[in-house]
Amino acid sequence: MKHESSLNRIVIALGGNALGNTPKEQEEKVNVAAESLVNLIAQGNEIILAHGNGPQVGMINLAFDLASKQNNKVAEFDLPECTAMSQGYIGYHLQKGIKKELKRQEMPWHVATIVTQILVDKDDPAFKNPQKPIGGYYDEATAREFMERDPHIVFGEDAGRGWRRMVPSPRPVDIVEKDSIINMLDNAFIVIAWGGGGIPVIQDEKGDYQGIPAVIDKDLAAAKLAEIVEADYLFILTAVDRVSINWGMPNQQDLA
């Protein structure tokens, strides 16, 4: 079904690595990207921004884990809360950069971030095989030290680049906040949603949503988002030069 807007509706997925490794670097990259994003609006499009958070959420989670072990006044935060934090601060930088560019171009559009929950199947086989890398890169000795400190944490080697924390990556089923996203799109908002693939949730026996420690693949999430909002286009932006299969392996093949 086609959405009712006369404008082209575009979902843009920004890779977490494309946003930099520190808040300062991230803000600088967002400010550079903001002009191109706002230009899409000026050309007769409406946009929804999704973004990765692999480096960011991993660093947030690890920081709280280490701090809580050093100081009992620091609470531990599980992955759903850390994902929400990353959605907040990445969304803040995106909002600020885009709002500044909207003002410069004298455009009356609004911009807002929605903390987004994503429904997943509690029986998804991914929960038995955590393979989604998040956070920074470590040598093997450091990674094994982290696992010795906390047996619930799993680290694995990531395509020859180092060791990273591995978490389950279930497939997205639905967006809890989809009505809010569509309503804002229909009212001249640039919407920032589904940050980091969204906060994975399952429904309990009462029908309430419960967060779970997992990360949804950002590209799968963006595709589901594009489907739900009936987007005309889906753009996936990343820090790598081209699309490849068997990436980082001897039989790597570049597709584009």
Regions found by a protein language model. Give the residues of each.
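Short acidic, glycine/serine/threonine-rich loops at helix termini
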Residues: 22-24, 58-63, 123-129, 203-205, ...
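Short beta-strand segments at enzyme active-site cores
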Residues: 11-13, 46-59, 110-115, 191-194, ...
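Conserved mixed alpha/beta catalytic, RNA-binding, or beta-rich assembly cores of soluble enzyme
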Residues: 18-20, 175, 190-246
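Ligand-binding beta-strand-loop-alpha-helix segment within the catalytic cores
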Residues: 67-191
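N-terminal glycine-/serine-/threonine-rich phosphate-binding loop
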Residues: 1-50, 59-69, 78, 183-186
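A glycine- and small-aliphatic-rich helix-loop capping segment at beta-alpha/alpha-beta transitions
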Residues: 26-31, 63-74, 128-136, 206-213
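Solvent-exposed alpha-helices and their adjacent loops that cap or buttress functional pockets
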Residues: 2-6, 11, 104-107, 173, ...
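Alpha-helix C-terminal capping segments
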Residues: 39-43, 93-103, 224-232
